[in-house]
Amino acid sequence: MALKKMPPKKPYHQKASKTKACYNCHRKRLRCDKSLPACLKCSINGEECLGYGIVLRWAACNSPTSTITTRTTNKTNFNGTNTTTPRTVKSSTPTQAPTPSDSPRQLDTDVTSSSAPSHTCSRSTTTSTTTTRISSPTLEETIDSFTVETPIDNNVDPLPRAPDDNPDPSSQIIKRPVNLIKIPLTDPLLNGLSTKARWYMHHFATIVCRDLVSIDQKERNPFRAIIPLVRKFDYLQSVVLATAAMHLSTIHKYQGRSLPSESALVDALMLKSRALHLLRAAINDNTLTDKAMILSAIVFLVNLDLIDSGRGGWKAHVGAARRLISSLYLTKAHLDGAIAPLVNAIAADCLTYRIYGSTISGNTSSWSDNTIDDGVVLPYILQNAEAYSYHCAPPAILQIILSASQLCSGSSTTLETDGGAGRIVTAAALLHKARNFDVQTWVYNIKGLPPDDDLEARVSVASAHRAAACLFVLLSVPETGLLEIPLLEPKDLVQEILGHLSCIPDNHVHLKGTVWPTFVVGAETDDLSERAWCLERLVAVWTKNPWTYPWGYVHTAMEMLQEIWRLKDLAAQQGDDGINWLQRLKATENSCLIV
């Protein structure tokens, strides 16, 4: 009797005691065989069975980058096209603060909000999308909660699979790295600031501070010393942000971007209003540091007006700042060494603005202050900032310009009753002092200049200021021309100024210091080609120079030049060739500031 061969026994698989399917089958809604230690169906499909218990998810990963596995399940719409259902994967990888390259149009509305901003970035696409939510488990990690939708390109091959992988055609697992960069916690100055405020602060530190000096030395730019102080003085923070917002608004306006320009302008005006409100509350603080910071805020309000158009309330700001300068410098007080360079540079800018503003701004008799203009305090303050001032004008020449402004008809507090003979003698003394000033010696003795500074260009700018100061004296006291001083005829001075200005290329860093002499010589000349050349130089400062961004006062200077030329040409047609454009301009009570 032949023995019957028994069929081989099938391998025994222990059944799971639980009735719940494994994690994979449960997610796919498949019938699970509930085998132990792993589901047999997962093994056949080449997948790793995740078991029957609770799936653990990482909630505090310290890695700066992570690979997020996302499952997208294909479904069929009623029109027969395939769609995908996104799954959500949670991670706690920190994210970075907004970079300066972000457009300000995409930033928060409240520029001083202290809460963490919520970012939402989305793209509409016909392909499948992956939604990733970043959770914030602890407040100390300062992680912004946001939702990022990343489009999945079906034409791009996923990461290589193992040879035994056999993916389910109804589902697809795509692993793609998500680079999430941590927030830089090393700079506490930005903590508590909104995204837009951080953008404005970055713009101030990188662009505005560069415009305020002759040559930007990152470690020696005194205006950057104001940034660490904005956390302590709220009015200073508002002024700094307002200045940066106005600067951005001017740039967008020049580029023809009306919406960003209007948005930044609204921010600037709101921040300026807030700064003025905070300054009123802090004006009674009597400590030395408080006075210095209030002075800084007021002078930056003048800078804000210059960036806007050079018009506005800069006169009131300059007057208030000069009173603070008197209390700081005349009391022989010693400032903290950390803020002394900042205060010196700001005080010098304030007095320089006062001097240039007095040249064409109508009656300035209310500005007379012998305690500042006594020939001792004024040069001392200006000399402390010679290496930083972008005007590149010698303090002695600036003082001559101020004295000539006080001699100008209708603006001098020392008008003589002897037919103006005293004014003529004083003006002649100013001319003699200006002509004998050694520009080259002054430039080569300036302390603190960078080694790569173009000293010859500085000599040309300072020489142009010296010749323009002489021309300004002749225009302020026209009777001085009767003395017939050699080489001091207006036409000779015009050619001298143009010669010095032509030595400075359009793309030179010191071109921004030539605005005032270019304006003076352009207003004086009657030659059409010279007028066109002066206007072209101002346009170069406004648009073409790579070392400075558009400031509104430069555009105002161009508009005023064209108006002066129109008045002079109209007077010439009527037979009046001897019009004094400076006297005519001062008679209009113009409040423009051209520096």
Swiss-Prot record:
Biased composition annotated in UniProt, kind: Polar residues: 89-117
Disulfide linkage: none
Pfam families on file: Fungal_trans_2 (PF11951), Zn_clus (PF00172)
Entry keyword Metal-binding: yes
DNA-binding region extent: 22-49
Compositional bias per record (Low complexity), positions renumbered to this chain: 69-88, 118-138
Domain of life according to the entry: Eukaryota
Keyword Zinc (UniProt): yes
PROSITE patterns: ZN2_CY6_FUNGAL_1, ZN2_CY6_FUNGAL_2
Region described as Disordered: spans on this chain: 69-172
InterPro entries named among the record's database cross-references: Fun_TF, Zn2-C6_fun-type_DNA-bd_sf, Zn2Cys6_DnaBD
Molecular-function GO terms, alphabetical: DNA-binding transcription factor activity; DNA-binding transcription factor activity, RNA polymerase II-specific; transcription cis-regulatory region binding; zinc ion binding
A GO BP annotation: positive regulation of transcription by RNA polymerase II
GO annotation, cellular component aspect: nucleus
Subcellular locations according to the entry: Nucleus
Keywords: DNA-binding, Metal-binding, Nucleus, Transcription, Transcription regulation, Zinc
Protein function: Probable transcriptional regulator.
Protein name: Acriflavine sensitivity control protein acr-2
Species for this entry: Neurospora crassa (strain ATCC 24698 / 74-OR23-1A / CBS 708.71 / DSM 1257 / FGSC 987)
